[in-house]
Amino acid sequence: MDSSLQHKTTKIFPSQASRDSLSNRVTMISGAKPLAFSIERIMSRTPEPKCLPVPSLLQGSVPKGDQKQALHINSSSIPCMIPFVPVAYDHCPKIGISGAELRKSHLDSSPPFSCNDLLNCALTLKGDFPREALPLQQYKLVRPRVVNHSSFHAMGAAFCYFNRGDSQCHPPASINIHPVASYFLGSPLHQAPKSYLAERNKLVLPSVEKFSSGVTFKDLSQAQFQHYMKEGAHSLSDKITFKTSAKFSSASPSNKPKVFTCEVCGKVFNAHYNLTRHMPVHTGARPFVCKICGKGFRQASTLCRHKIIHTQEKPHKCNQCGKAFNRSSTLNTHTRIHAGYKPFVCEFCGKGFHQKGNYKNHKLTHSGEKQFKCNICNKAFHQIYNLTFHMHTHNDKKPFTCPTCGKGFCRNFDLKKHVRKLHDSNTAAPHAIGGTGQEELLLPNREPSPTIQSPQLQKSGY
């Protein structure tokens, strides 16, 4: 047990010789400039005491002996390990320290003030350092994190203030200091910092001056400390309105403003790419063409799904009728036929459909609009593919022929229906004259599945 523990410890903390060697290598690479985060300081840093929740602190559950120890601040000079980075956000004229001083304190080897000067180090900021110095009013609290080198976290306290003295709370007269409860700035509630940021928070919260100049936390009694913590929590609860700002709402993909509008139909899209994919619906362009059968598609994804039918692989079979399909989604739609499930119901006549496409085609029969007309006989159709198949009747082009009786059909759907009704199911696969290059395999000994005739087929006598 001891040997395994010693082995684990050796893994986590390297030997002194290896640390010295690594430190020398880093110093040689970096040149004369000392490192902000030295290897020795990181490896020898002791873990922070865990925070107790603030409600237990306010209820007085901390023993008296621990209270005095918790109120004690270690006044040793420990350089801050969290960088301050300026960002132009919200101007607060109460603070006047320059960004160059903050940068110098975190990059130089001998910072002018220690972590106790900026107690709690709960200021993690975003942005890039500008060449000129920025006032501290252009800093914002982005993600409060507790990296306190004192023992205040034993009581669950997290203070958000700017302190210029060693272990003393004597800010400039122009700055108002306010304590902040750790459950608003700490990690127990992850949503609280987001709500806090949504309201344009300032680096130092405005409030009535509570700490006089030269007062140390050692001089504060437990009652005063609890009073300040309660007041800080109430102040935040009054100021913070838990609603999402435009900054956070715009970051969600589902809440993006839809600004791309189709000039033809008025449909609105949230991205220009979606509008580009929509335009072939009006132009009729089908740039993605199948190299086997020559069929065109509006989108590349539809062409990829279409190519599966040329592989003649149908691994998905129906357990009831034995019909096979290329895709599992088609099989799931097919099972609705056996179950009698018709989720798409016409609101005009009450007729149900298994598939959404058939439902849309049926709704066009109620609209009375037949915008696709034949140039030869002026016959109109609801959809363009019906007009395409109708044109075969004028040029006597019937690419699909029955191998048994030799009858030709304009559509493969009509040929398969003819074979199921009139001929044996063991018949060989039908040919494609005129060459689509596509062959449909008929499964042997299969019960004829029910078919749904469209209104156009009923009128044409198929």
Curated annotation (Swiss-Prot):
Record keyword Zinc present: yes
Residue intervals of every C2H2-type zinc finger in the record: 260-282, 288-310, 316-338, 344-366, 372-394, 400-423
GO molecular function: DNA binding; zinc ion binding
UniProt keyword annotations, A-Z: Developmental protein, Differentiation, DNA-binding, Metal-binding, Neurogenesis, Nucleus, Repeat, Repressor, Transcription, Transcription regulation, Zinc, Zinc-finger
Composition-biased stretches (Polar residues): 448-462
GO biological process terms on file: cell differentiation; nervous system development
Subcellular location: Nucleus
PROSITE patterns per UniProt: ZINC_FINGER_C2H2_1, ZINC_FINGER_C2H2_2
Region (Disordered): 441-462
Function: Transcription repressor. Involved in the development of the forebrain region.
Recorded family membership: Belongs to the krueppel C2H2-type zinc-finger protein family.
Name of the protein in its database record: Fez family zinc finger protein 1
